[in-house]
Structure formats: C-alpha cells, structure tokens
C-alpha cells in the first residue's frame, strides 16, 4: 500500500533448506523445484532442455545447493499421492497444494501465508473494513479470502469449489472480466 509491503509471510533461508531436504528425501535428489523470491523465480530444470513454457523464460537456473534467499513460495514435482502424504507429514507447518491443471506440481507455502491472513493488515493500512473489500479468485488458495471479503468474485475458469463459494462468478481470468466487473461497480 502506497509503495510499502503490508503483509509478507515466507521461508527464511534455513527453512528453505529444510524444505529442500524433505523434498529430496521423499521425492528424490533430482526432483524439479522452483522457488519464488523477491529477487526472482529460480528453477532447477534440466539445462539441456528449454523450460517448456515461454512464460518461464526469465527463470534463473539454480541447483539450490547454496541457496540462501528468503522464499515466498516453493514448488516441487511430487509424482505420487504417497509422496504428497509423506511430504505433508514431514512439513506440518506448511500448506501443500496441487496446482489445478498441473497434477504433479505442488505449491508449498507456510501455513500462515494465506490471502485471507493478508486481508486484515491490508484493511488496516487502507482504513477499510473487510466488508468493503472485493476479492477475486480462481483456485483453492482463494477460498477463505473470498468467504471473508465483503464481495467474493470467482473467475469463470476457476475451480468449481471457488465458484460455489463466491458471491458472483464473472468471465475467465484471461479476458478483461475483472476490468469489466469493476467498471460496473464504478457507477
């Protein structure tokens, strides 16, 4: 808000290494991992192959051996349900969720790093009450935020649970649906 960070909850470097160790122990030493930091997106993809999606072309390659940055989010390829359950048991302080549409990629965040937890500090910084907030979402990580906000808006391509929890569903997030919705609210 006004150029200042209002809420941030991630992994200190020592915690990042703990998460890496658990991933490698459970899923194997060669498991693909990505890390989002304030400095960029890091990935240990096979350097003999290009990243599969041009959107990831700016990823910074790392083997993560000496990785010492604060991480906002860690993602890993976790191929089996058994490995997912083992990872959840090994990291009880983390939220581990499969990306919708990406069956083997799982997002790992601190369990306290939620969009819903960010609403109160944002409201306080802006001098608003939560009932004045309109929140937009399309995936499972958005559910609690949509329920807390004064108006929860699901994207048309969102998962069914998000659409069911929202007050309204608009067009998909690859269109101008949010802008169109906000324009109708501006009157």
Question: For each predicted feature, which ranges?
Answer:
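A short acidic, helix-capping loop that chelates divalent metal ions and anchors anionic groups
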Residues: 1-2, 105-107, 162
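Glycine/small-residue-rich loop that forms an oxyanion/phosphate-binding "nest" at active or ligand-binding sites
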Residues: 1-17, 23
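Conserved active-site and cofactor/substrate-binding residues in soluble primary-metabolism enzymes
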Residues: 14, 114, 173
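Conserved acidic, metal-coordinating active-site core of Asp-based
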Residues: 18, 22-136, 140-145, 157
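Asp-based, Mg2+/Mn2+-dependent phosphohydrolase catalytic module
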Residues: 148, 153-187
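Short, surface-exposed amphipathic charged segments that create phosphate/polyanion-binding patches used
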Residues: 4-7, 49-51, 114-115, 184-187
């Amino acid at each position: 808000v006004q150029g200042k960070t209002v809420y941030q909850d991630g992994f200190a470097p020592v915690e990042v290494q703990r998460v890496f160790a658990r991933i490698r122990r459970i899923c194997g030493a060669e498991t693909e991992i990505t890390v989002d930091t304030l400095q960029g997106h890091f990935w240990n993809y096979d350097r003999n192959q290009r990243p599969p999606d041009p959107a990831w072309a700016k990823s910074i390659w790392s083997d993560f051996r000496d990785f010492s940055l604060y991480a906002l989010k860690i993602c890993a390829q976790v191929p089996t349900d058994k490995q997912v359950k083992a990872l959840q048991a090994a990291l009880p302080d983390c939220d581990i969720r499969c990306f919708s549409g990406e069956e083997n990629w799982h997002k790992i965040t601190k369990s306290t790093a939620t969009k819903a937890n960010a609403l109160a500090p944002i409201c306080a910084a802006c001098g608003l009450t939560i009932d004045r907030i309109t929140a937009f979402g399309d995936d499972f990580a958005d559910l609690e935020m949509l329920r807390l906000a004064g108006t929860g808006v699901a994207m048309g391509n969102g998962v069914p649970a998000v659409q069911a929890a929202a007050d309204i569903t608009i067009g998909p997030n690859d269109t101008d649906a949010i802008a169109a919705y906000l324009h109708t609210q501006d009157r």
